[in-house]
């Protein structure tokens, strides 16, 4: 599926597309709630979850064959907690790299989901913990955080 990089609203765009094998995440994406929910054949994701994305519930839920590496650019307003529930339960596994976006976080430092002003490490660790809490027991997902980040 070719989605233009300028696309912002992707909620439910391919929800339940059981034959979808690969997808590119647009760099302008903001709302991605249930975009690829139930895409059971989805294996490959290109692009990254941009820091502009603040709505991503059930983004890849039920995508059991996800594999490779996906980067998520994170701010204090990022929530990915239910984005990967029941995902990557088959196949070779998925690695998610959480990268802190200090520039975008400065805009929302006191209004973020993680309780106001927090360090990059605190935000990334809280985000990682909230994501891992929603993985199914059979998920082959590894989350790492990018240590090369700057604080504002």
Regions found by a protein language model. Name each.
Residues 1-8, 18-30, 40-54, 64-78, ...:
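Structural signature of tandem-repeat unit edges
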Residues 11-15, 33-37, 57-61, 81-84, ...:
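Consensus positions within tandem repeat domains that build extended binding/scaffold surfaces
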Residues 105-116:
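Short, flexible/disordered intra-domain loops and linkers
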């Amino acid at each position: 599926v070719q989605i233009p990089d300028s696309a912002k609203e992707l909620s439910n765009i391919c929800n339940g597309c059981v034959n979808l094998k690969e997808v590119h995440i647009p760099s302008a994406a903001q709302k991605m709630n249930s975009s690829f929910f139930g895409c059971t054949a989805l294996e490959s994701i290109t692009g990254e979850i941009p820091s502009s994305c603040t709505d991503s519930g059930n983004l890849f839920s039920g995508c059991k064959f996800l594999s490779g590496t996906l980067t998520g650019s994170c701010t204090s307003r990022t929530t990915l907690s239910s984005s990967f529930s029941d995902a990557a339960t088959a196949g070779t596994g998925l690695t998610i790299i959480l990268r802190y976006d200090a520039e975008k976080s400065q805009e929302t430092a006191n209004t973020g989901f993680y309780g106001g002003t927090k360090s990059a490490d605190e935000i990334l660790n809280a985000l990682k913990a909230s994501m891992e809490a929603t993985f199914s027991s059979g998920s082959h997902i590894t989350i790492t955080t990018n240590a090369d980040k700057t604080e504002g």
